[in-house]
Curated annotation (Swiss-Prot):
Entry GO terms, CC: chloroplast thylakoid membrane
Described purpose of this protein according to its UniProt entry: Produces ATP from ADP in the presence of a proton gradient across the membrane. The catalytic sites are hosted primarily by the beta subunits.
Keyword line: ATP synthesis, Chloroplast, Hydrogen ion transport, Ion transport, Membrane, Plastid, Thylakoid, Translocase, Transport
Family the UniProt entry places it in: Belongs to the ATPase alpha/beta chains family.
EC number: 7.1.2.2
Protein induction: Expression shows a diurnal pattern of oscillation across the 24-hour light-dark, with increased levels during the light period (at protein level).
Compositional bias ranges of the Polar residues kind: 1-10
Name recorded for this polypeptide: ATP synthase subunit beta, chloroplastic
Subunit structure: F-type ATPases have 2 components, CF(1) - the catalytic core - and CF(0) - the membrane proton channel. CF(1) has five subunits: alpha(3), beta(3), gamma(1), delta(1), epsilon(1). CF(0) has four main subunits: a(1), b(1), b'(1) and c(9-12).
Length: 20
């Protein structure tokens, strides 16, 4: 589960700027 949480954070850093 911890790995999944880190994956979500990693994806958020990528998609965050894209959405902005």
């Amino acid at each position: 589960m911890e790995t999944t949480n880190e994956s979500l954070g990693y994806t958020d850093q990528i998609i965050g700027p894209v959405l902005d």
